[in-house]
Regions:
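Interdomain hinge/linker segments and adjacent boundary elements that couple functional modules
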Residues: 2-15, 19, 23, 33-37, ...
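Short alpha-helical DNA-recognition segment
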Residues: 28-47
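A ubiquitous short alpha-helical element
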Residues: 45-50, 242-246
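C-terminal regulatory/effector modules of DNA-binding transcriptional regulators
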Residues: 184-299
Length: 299
């Protein structure tokens, strides 16, 4: 299947625009400091624009077009269009009060990803959580309003990610996620039935790391790896009690996490065995005696 990005997002426009402007600067042989001096800007402002961390006003873009001697009308028009799009509000703007900065930045990358590789050691990954399963998890938060907004954010995020057929997905989860009771038997049964449905999608792999796999690299916490449409670059997103972390422009670090992910895939059951295990667990949860039963041997 050809890899296609998701629908455009302001942060994706910022990154593309930053890359285009950086290439134009480099074509003239200008360093970032030389360009900043010529534009009478701070170096940090130029760096933020080139990194896609900051939108570009039309007036600033005109200054850069002049400084970089960009004369082709088609290129100028494309840059202007991208600059306007880069300053639009992101879809998650209504949730900014409850979204930590690293996750907000991650959402911008997610919107232009062509491949998702996602791992969770003991829960169903967020993109695959049903509404009632997610709601049960969010009940642990002391602020009910925050919990409701996060639930709405998750629902909209899922809809956006799965709205396009282009991206490919590899989900890996620890077998514990099939047995940890979130919301009770019926909630878990519906959640796992949904996982079994997802497992059959042609663009999706869902793999279970069995208990018997023992210890493995990366098992300490959730991990997301995204391959971006713009340039094939990968970014990593990590969740932890100490705070979330988004990693970009650190190839060696991202390679380490990618290697860990592939190790987890290697220790997981095949797609077919994973789906079978999930369906067996769904059937088990449908039996009255399932309440509180550990049936890890039902494979």
């Amino acid at each position: 299947m050809a890899e296609q990005p998701l629908a455009d997002d302001p942060s994706a426009h910022r990154r593309r625009l930053g890359d285009d402007l950086r290439r134009s600067r480099e074509a003239l042989g200008l360093t970032q400091q030389q360009a900043a001096d010529q534009l009478e800007w701070s170096l940090s402002k130029l760096i933020r624009i080139e990194n896609g961390a900051h939108g570009v006003s039309v007036s600033d873009l005109r200054s850069m077009i002049g400084a970089y001697r960009i004369s082709g009308q088609r290129q100028v028009d494309a840059l202007m269009t991208a600059a306007r799009a880069s300053r639009a509000k992101a879809w998650w703007s209504p949730y900014r009060d409850v979204v930590p900065t690293p996750f907000a930045r991650y959402l911008g990358y997610e919107a232009s990803a062509v491949r998702f590789r996602i791992f969770h050691p003991f829960l169903v990954p967020g993109l695959l959580q049903t509404g009632e399963y997610a709601a049960e998890l969010l009940k642990t938060l002391p602020d009910a309003r925050r919990a409701q907004l996060l639930l709405e954010l998750k629902r909209e995020r899922q809809q956006r990610v799965f709205a396009q057929p282009g991206p490919s997905f590899v989900f890996v989860m620890g077998e514990e996620g099939l047995y940890r009771w979130i919301g009770g038997r019926e909630v878990m049964q519906r959640q796992l039935a949904y996982l079994a449905e997802v497992a059959r999608r042609p663009n999706t792999q869902l793999r279970i790391v069995p208990f018997e796999a023992g210890a493995y690299p990366g098992m300490a916490g959730p991990l997301v790896l995204l391959k971006l449409a713009e340039n094939g670059e990968e970014v990593a997103f990590l969740e932890s009690v100490g705070g979330d972390e988004l990693i970009r422009d650190e190839p060696a670090t991202i390679t380490k996490y990618a290697d860990n992910f592939e190790t987890m895939v290697g220790k997981s059951l095949s797609r077919e065995r994973s789906e079978t295990l999930i369906r067996e667990r769904v059937e088990q949860l449908g039996r009255p005696e399932a309440q509180g039963t550990d049936s890890r041997g039902a494979r």
